[in-house]
């Protein structure tokens, strides 16, 4: 690794530790030329499948888009950021577990709805009403009835 101080190629690892619940490695390094010390963080780069939208357009998976949709549904609801992040991580893990290089956006939407159903029923109804394009109050009632079963 290049030294950020003198740009030398020769650095050595002094200490390594697992951080972020074992998802990252923190390394203390020392430059063999200028002897400055610095910290690096290393984590696995996991490839997410491309998303095939309902109109057939393919686009890279966008975690921010996923997070924004979930947060919008949970707006002003009593759900912690930690629980939201756990849900996002479960969704991403499920998508990677398919082993597919491309995945339909409908599958992502269904995973989001399942997570919201566990987190907050009101947020689930909010998301479902937009995702499934509810036309009238009857559709809300039908979805609420399904939730109560």
Curated annotation (Swiss-Prot):
Gene Ontology molecular function, alphabetical: ATP binding; DNA binding; zinc ion binding
Zn finger residue spans: unnamed: 3-34
Keywords from the named record: ATP-binding, DNA-binding, Metal-binding, Nucleotide-binding, Repressor, Transcription, Transcription regulation, Zinc, Zinc-finger
PROSITE patterns in UniProt: ATP_CONE
Ranges of residues in domain ATP-cone: 49-139
GO biological process terms held by the UniProt record: negative regulation of DNA-templated transcription
Cofactor(s) needed for function: Zn(2+)
Disulphide-bridged cysteine pairs: none
Free-text comment on the cofactor: Binds 1 zinc ion.
The keyword Disulfide bond appears for this protein: no
PANTHER family with a match to the protein in the record: TRANSCRIPTIONAL REPRESSOR NRDR (PTHR30455:SF2)
NCBIfam families: transcriptional regulator NrdR
Similarity field: Belongs to the NrdR family.
Function: Negatively regulates transcription of bacterial ribonucleotide reductase nrd genes and operons by binding to NrdR-boxes.
Stated name of the protein: Transcriptional repressor NrdR
Organism, as annotated: Tolumonas auensis (strain DSM 9187 / NBRC 110442 / TA 4)
């Amino acid at each position: 690794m290049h030294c950020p101080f003198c740009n030398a190629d020769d650095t050595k690892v002094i200490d390594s530790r697992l951080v972020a619940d074992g998802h990252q490695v923190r390394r203390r390094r020392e430059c063999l030329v200028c002897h400055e010390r610095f910290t690096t963080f290393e984590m696995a780069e996991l490839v997410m499948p491309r998303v095939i939208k309902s109109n057939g357009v393919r686009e890279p998976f966008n975690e921010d888009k996923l997070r924004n949709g979930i947060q919008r549904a949970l707006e002003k609801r009593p759900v912690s950021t930690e629980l939201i992040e756990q849900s996002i991580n479960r969704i991403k893990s499920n998508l990677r577990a398919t082993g597919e290089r491309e995945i339909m956006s409908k599958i992502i939407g269904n995973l989001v709805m399942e997570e919201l159903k566990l987190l907050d029923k009101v947020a689930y109804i909010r998301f479902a009403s937009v995702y499934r394009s509810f036309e009238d109050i009857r559709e809300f009632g039908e979805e609420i009835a399904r939730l109560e079963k």
